[in-house]
């Protein structure tokens, strides 16, 4: 099986060699950062349509974590185009963080379409180093389709715990590796290197639930599901929330 995976990966490498050459020359990262927001703004429309019920379920109790003022302070890490905004409760104070500055113009459009929120600021930073956000300063942190592409899951989860107030919550929805015995997992392994390059560092075979289980949360509510998505490769999902 490993030999078959190697041969198929080699074939895909040959087919996508121009991308690897651009990456070797240091050009692909710049191109990817430019085009990825345009891809994501279209992908998230489809994703939100197919995952709307799960997102509404996930975010249904957000307001329960509001601070004494009654207003919810929310930090979204890897905010992308602002696809989650419509699921947040009215009056929610939202800060966004993303390492790609090219998302900002799409965020501005999303903010204009979601007047029920109080937008605070957009910070260009990686989730592994959110030094611009003070310790214990937010009620809720949200990550959706982010843990698949971060460079260090343990570090970003430590940062999440740092910025959350005691009793605050971390909400997540992530595609993950399929069960090892399935054909889906086989094709995830075959396509993972090319997928990682093409989709801005995204990984198909991450077992993100393990990092969440190891993190220093006092409570973890996590579910595994087969998401109702068109792309079978990303149907295996986890979603839920963890309390600091």
UniProtKB/Swiss-Prot annotation:
What keywords appear on the UniProt entry?
Cytoplasm, Endoplasmic reticulum, Host-virus interaction, Lipid droplet, Membrane, Methylation, Methyltransferase, Microsome, Signal, Transferase
Q: What class of enzyme is it?
A: transferase
Q: Where is this region: Targeting to lipid droplets?
A: 1-28
Write down the Gene3D superfamilies for this protein, in alphabetical order: Vaccinia Virus protein VP39 (3.40.50.150)
The EC number(s) attached to this protein equal 2.1.1.9, 2.1.1.348
Catalytically driven reaction(s)? a thiol + S-adenosyl-L-methionine = a methyl thioether + S-adenosyl-L-homocysteine + H(+); an adenosine in mRNA + S-adenosyl-L-methionine = an N(6)-methyladenosine in mRNA + S-adenosyl-L-homocysteine + H(+)
| Signal peptide boundaries | 1-29
What is the name attached to this protein's record? Thiol S-methyltransferase TMT1A
Please report the organism this UniProt entry assigns to the protein.
Homo sapiens (Human)
Name of encoding gene? TMT1A
């Amino acid at each position: 099986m490993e030999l078959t995976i190697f041969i198929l990966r080699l074939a895909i490498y040959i087919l996508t060699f121009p991308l690897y050459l651009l990456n070797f020359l240091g050009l692909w990262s710049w191109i990817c950062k430019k085009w990825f927001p345009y891809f994501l703004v279209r992908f998230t429309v489809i994703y939100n349509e197919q995952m709307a019920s799960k997102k509404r379920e996930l975010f249904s109790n957000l307001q329960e974590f509001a601070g004494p003022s009654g207003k919810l302070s929310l930090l979204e890490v890897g905010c992308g185009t602002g696809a989650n905004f419509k699921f947040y409760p009215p009056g929610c104070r939202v800060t966004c963080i993303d390492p790609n500055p090219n998302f900002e113009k799409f965020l501005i459009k999303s903010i204009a379409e979601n007047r029920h929120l109080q937008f605070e600021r957009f910070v260009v930073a990686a989730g592994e180093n959110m030094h611009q956000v003070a310790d214990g300063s937010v009620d809720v942190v949200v990550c959706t389709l982010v843990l698949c592409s971060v460079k260090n899951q343990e570090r970003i989860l430590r940062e999440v715990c740092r910025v959350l107030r005691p009793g605050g919550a971390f909400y997540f929805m992530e595609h993950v590796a399929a069960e090892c015995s399935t054909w889906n997992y086989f094709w995830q392994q075959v396509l993972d290197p090319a997928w990682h390059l093409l989709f801005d560092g995204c990984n198909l075979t991450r077992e993100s639930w393990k990092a969440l289980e190891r993190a220093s949360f006092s409570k973890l509510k996590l579910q595994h599901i087969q998401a109702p998505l068109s792309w079978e490769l990303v149907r295996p999902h986890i979603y839920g929330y963890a309390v600091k």
